[in-house]
Regions:
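Signature of N6-adenine DNA methyltransferases within the class I
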Residues: 13-23, 32, 40-47, 70-224
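Short, conserved SAM-binding/catalytic segment
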Residues: 48-60
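Conserved SAM-binding strand-loop segment of SAM-dependent methyltransferases
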Residues: 59-70
């Protein structure tokens, strides 16, 4: 990504753009950055537009606000980065819409929206980074999703515990992966806000088929 001077970023379920100041700061060295910001809630986009007007980012940053359902929207572009915080909820009250979502999904065992978001993001971006519930790494519901992620070049997992969002008592993690990678790395970085550690370990060790879930804290003591 360092060599590219023009990049395109997609943030699905952007809300009011909590991540945008960080992204603007991170990519201020680029000549041009185009953001496609999508949300199903038009009110959130109205608020976001007002925030961007006050923020006044440099002109090299372009913001396209799209009021649509990310999961059903037809994208023409492919993206250098897809980043965000997809919704964490199961769709149970709209069977017709759930059927539509599942028809495009690989993991049909889950009704959780964030699982569908992960799959579509992988199809659209070179790099994908999402904050999602920690249940992704250990729930049987996401076995297929984990297999899909493991098929990409997983670079890093961060464990925030309950520190991801103030006032929200749900354990979250984030992941960073690369989709268009000819050679996958053997190691992955695990950063923990719980233990205050950053370690690099073999993927085959943490994601071993001997266990039904990912053991991101696996160590010699565990193996005894």
């Amino acid at each position: 990504m360092k060599e590219k001077k023009r990049i395109r970023i997609l943030e699905p379920s952007v809300g009011i753009g909590n991540f945008l100041p960080l992204l603007i700061a991170k990519f201020e060295d680029k000549d041009e950055v185009i953001f496609d910001l999508i949300d199903i809630d038009n009110h959130s986009l109205i608020v976001l537009k007002a925030i961007l007007e006050k923020l006044k980012p440099p002109r090299k940053f372009t913001f396209n606000l799209i009021n649509a359902d990310f999961l059903t929207h037809n994208f023409v572009e492919k993206y250098d980065i897809v980043v965000g915080n997809p919704p964490y909820r199961k769709l149970t009250n709209n069977k017709k819409l759930l059927t539509r979502y599942k028809s495009a999904a690989i993991n049909k065992e889950s009704n959780n929206l964030f699982s569908f978001f992960i799959e579509k993001a992988i199809s659209l971006g070179r790099f994908v980074s999402f904050i999602v519930p920690k249940s992704l790494i250990n729930s049987p519901e996401f076995d297929i999703t984990r297999n899909l992620l493991n098929g990409q070049n997983l670079i890093k997992i961060c464990d925030y515990g309950e520190k991801g969002f103030k006032g929200v008592k749900i354990e979250t993690i984030s992941f960073l992966l690369e989709t268009a990678c000819k050679t996958k790395s053997e190691n992955i970085i695990i950063e923990s806000y719980i233990t205050g550690t950053v370690v690099e370990k073999k993927k085959e060790y943490l994601f071993s088929d001997k266990f039904p879930y990912w053991l991101i804290y696996r160590n010699e003591l565990f193996d005894q």
